[in-house]
Amino acid sequence: MALELLTPFTKVELEEERKDKNRKQIGILGGNFNPVHNAHLLVADQVRQQLGLDEVLLMPEYKPPHVDKKATIDEKHRLKMLELAIKGIEGLAIETIELKRKGVSYTYDTMKDLIEQNPDVDYYFIIGADMVDYLPKWHKIDELIQMVQFVGVQRPKYKAGTSYPVIWVDVPLMDISSSMIRDFIRKNRKPNFLLPKLVLDYIEKEGLYQ
């Protein structure tokens, strides 16, 4: 099985390989970010640190194949909340390629375009442990695994296995979801400490998720 658990030895190997190639190492964390919350930021930052990446890009989807459009607010709000969430955070940035392209977002198409635009970059595509099980169903997955290195975020007590090459990273568990935050707001419960204060202030100012 091409299953790899991140260890100090693995990290050294990755760093030595990067020195030889002298290429930028960029992580990608895609999502609807409806809204972005602290667990998103924790995952992005921990993967960046543990793999020694130059940067992790948070990439909002325009119209993902698996999300009901009715449940997704306008992309201008999701983008603004991302901008507020990463303000002043080193090593995190935003990639808007899918918002600019519009239409349904397939990872293969997005990464193909990014690689063509940035031939000197190696990309690490970050997914949750539960998503690893679904890799065989991803659009053009066999081509995609030749283009990017998948990074699986390990969850406590969750054992995932795959025949695809995945680097596993352990990240502290934060049981937070965007749907939980939206539900809090609909019930007039303030979701303090679940997302950055600047994001919560924006949600309240714009009257989102009411």
Curated annotation (Swiss-Prot):
Transferase recorded as keyword: yes
Pfam family, one: CTP_transf_like
Pathway membership: Cofactor biosynthesis; NAD(+) biosynthesis; deamido-NAD(+) from nicotinate D-ribonucleotide: step 1/1
Enzyme Commission number: 2.7.7.18
EC class of the enzyme, as a word: transferase
Single GO BP term: NAD biosynthetic process
Chemical reaction(s) catalysed: nicotinate beta-D-ribonucleotide + ATP + H(+) = deamido-NAD(+) + diphosphate
Keywords: ATP-binding, NAD, Nucleotide-binding, Nucleotidyltransferase, Pyridine nucleotide biosynthesis, Transferase
GO molecular function term, any single one: ATP binding
Organism domain of life: Bacteria
The UniProt record lists the keyword Transferase: yes
Protein family per UniProt: Belongs to the NadD family.
Reported function: Catalyzes the reversible adenylation of nicotinate mononucleotide (NaMN) to nicotinic acid adenine dinucleotide (NaAD).
Record NCBIfam families: cyt_tran_rel, nicotinate (nicotinamide) nucleotide adenylyltransferase, PRK00071.1-3, PRK00071.1-4
Protein name (record): Probable nicotinate-nucleotide adenylyltransferase
Gene transcribed to yield this protein: nadD
